[in-house]
Amino acid sequence: MSGDVLLSIVVVALVFLAAVASGLLAVYSFRRIDHPLSESYGTLIAIVSLWAGGYLLMLVAGGTLLAEIGLFVKAVFSALAAFAWLRFVSEYTGDSEWLPGWLWWLGAAESIVWSVLVVSNPGGLILEGVEIGQFGVVTAAVETPGLGAAVQLLI
């Protein structure tokens, strides 16, 4: 049992560290770096930070309203991360002119629709369930993906 306690503390600490470190890198990129890629890099890292923050809420607030908020935040920013990554890579490789401007709006809309579907979970299509369990000193909420999650991965 003491191994579970230590492991749960390490997991929570590492997720917290990921959220804070990536958030600080995003702020640094936006404020201090004068480079053509700093905006797209900062956006990507800020989204990753918020994604980790949502996951942290799910870890520490299992079974409460905060865990559901964490699930929503994690769903929004995990979907946005793919579009932010595409934007960063296209600018990094110099191929951003091939991507239409409306693609980013489509990505934002898709991310919002996805997160609403995750939280509402119609008929268990998106998530088979959210398990609440004790993990060391943490009561964690962990979702089991459904068929809709597999479709989202293909998108």
Language model features by range: what are they?
Residues V5-S22, R31-G133, V142-I155:
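Individual alpha-helical transmembrane segments in multi-pass integral membrane proteins
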Residues M1-G3:
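Carboxylate-rich, polar loop motifs that coordinate divalent cations or form catalytic acidic clusters
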